[in-house]
Amino acid sequence: LLNMTSVQDLLINIVIIGIIPGIGEELLFRGVIQKEISKKLINPHVAIFITAFLFSAFHFQVAGFIPKLMIGLVLGYAYFLSGSLILPMIIHSLNNIFLTTSLFAAGGKIQTQDIQSENVPIAAVLFSLILFATLTYLILSITKPNLQQNE
């Protein structure tokens, strides 16, 4: 049970749930795993998918597997296209901060089994798909000029 009853609780959770995992997980998944898999494979897209799959599995949420896989793909492409861990760290941290702040705004209490429920609302899946497509488009729009300069 995550319980946030004050702004102080929110700020502590933003650091513990938002910022620290956003940095640490990106160092591990993109900075080590994706980088090492990319060295061994010719196709970087396969390395990004494998890393996103591992990222999603790492979170141990059956119902959240697909949304976490999609954010893992966004983070993987953000790293691949920008060539820097800073962009995926920022995206990951902002995602976590958004979720933490949303929980606080909803009353600050949520039980873990609510998150892991097998009954995922179709609206949540559609929202995840739209968010994934939007973030992918934005990342490609931002990084495409940089890629063309590097060629």
Sequence positions of predicted segments:
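Hydrophobic alpha-helical transmembrane segments
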Residues: 11, 15, 45-50, 65-66, ...
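C-terminal membrane module of polytopic membrane proteins
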Residues: 93-151
